[in-house]
């Protein structure tokens, strides 16, 4: 692209009308499916008309086939929506979900959109949920694990290829015993569920996110708990080389010693031959030299120079840095860390706004590494962060799918909110694949943070004679009107 400007490579950025997409076409499959769905449970209907609609727009913009859209919408309505709990009755969640801790507003679901590394790939959509059940928020279930375990069990029965033995084994090793007061004092959500809904697949891939809330366990994860869990899950002779490489870097490398282990892991719910588990860390250093050192494990893991160049371009764009800014210097941040200036209600160990995870399996000599950037700590607005990434994608030949993502987020919140607030965009994640940066967006429905706006969209205004009167934002058709 040479010296082309962002407007030249991405001209659609100048047109909100174009970027908003065609609401009717975005929701056509959603409305057709909705005609035949039950409406007797108000809680499930609420989640369907809000988050189900978001999912429909995502799939339309990601070019999923209509058959796949119908299949996944039915899965969403009958498997996911019933496990999202009661509909909100105020802007304060009755139970604060651990989805996107420190960033989320308590909504029990979040989304991700993965672009891939070239123009021939389709976006890949995932959901991350905390299952809500009858015991959630009670003293009978302080870790909120019963609803999640029930859901995982049902997914194992319902979805071909889902296997749970590794998840159960890892969970047993990191589950706190709750036998001492310090552990009970921090007890909270312990299981999240990831659901990958690929465009071309006939199935759904499942991941179990496991969180220990025991302060005594976290320092022992790398040294004793994860090694025992690996041998239990993969077999007594399973190679620990990948885990040992991570531990060596964290404990002995000068750059690794900036890292702090988080009490979190995640397990692919599939056969042991391909199921990986994740080790999450956060850092106190935000210089690009440090980020690059972690992504290569201090040179232990070879990566293409072009990958590192692309990562630097993205990091500098997100931070608004001059290209000549020294890679060894830490950029200053004047951004308030709370989304929209409000605290989420959950403590967040990720003070710097940067986390990494290492994907490990005994058969791989190196872990797969992903960098996650908390947008609320590094950019002024959601749109500023989104533009930094989508303009990079456009220059790389992925302008259509970059625009598709803009269509999704602009269908979820007004453009003015994207320009002036933070809260929809949670993270951007970056990994190396085939000599390029593989980018994933993590974003949030903001059901509680935008409670008033959501209610207004669900219930159009009445005129002085009691007739429905749609707001200007909802002209053509209410975005939630499905029945």
Swiss-Prot record:
GO terms for molecular function: prenyltransferase activity. It holds the Pfam family Trp_DMAT. Its EC number is 2.5.1.-. Viridicatumtoxin and its derivative, viridicatumtoxin B, exhibit anti-methicillin-resistant Staphylococcus aureus (anti-MRSA) activity. Moreover, viridicatumtoxin and a C2 acetyl analog, spirohexaline, have been demonstrated to inhibit bacterial undecaprenyl diphosphate synthase, a potential new target for antibiotic development. It comes from the Eukaryota. InterPro entries: Aro_prenylTrfase_DMATS. GO terms for biological process: alkaloid metabolic process; terpenoid biosynthetic process; viridicatumtoxin biosynthetic process. Keywords: Transferase. Pathway: Secondary metabolite biosynthesis; terpenoid biosynthesis. Transmembrane segments: none annotated. Prenyltransferase; part of the gene cluster that mediates the biosynthesis of viridicatumtoxin, a tetracycline-like fungal meroterpenoid with a unique, fused spirobicyclic ring system. The first step of the pathway is the production of the malonamoyl-CoA starter unit for the polyketide synthase vrtA. The aldolase vrtJ may be involved in the synthesis of the malonamate substrate for malonamoyl-CoA synthetase vrtB. The polyketide synthase vrtA then may utilize the malonamoyl-CoA starter unit, followed by sequential condensation of eight malonyl-CoA units to form the polyketide backbone. Belongs to the tryptophan dimethylallyltransferase family. This is Prenyltransferase vrtC. It comes from Penicillium aethiopicum. The gene is vrtC.
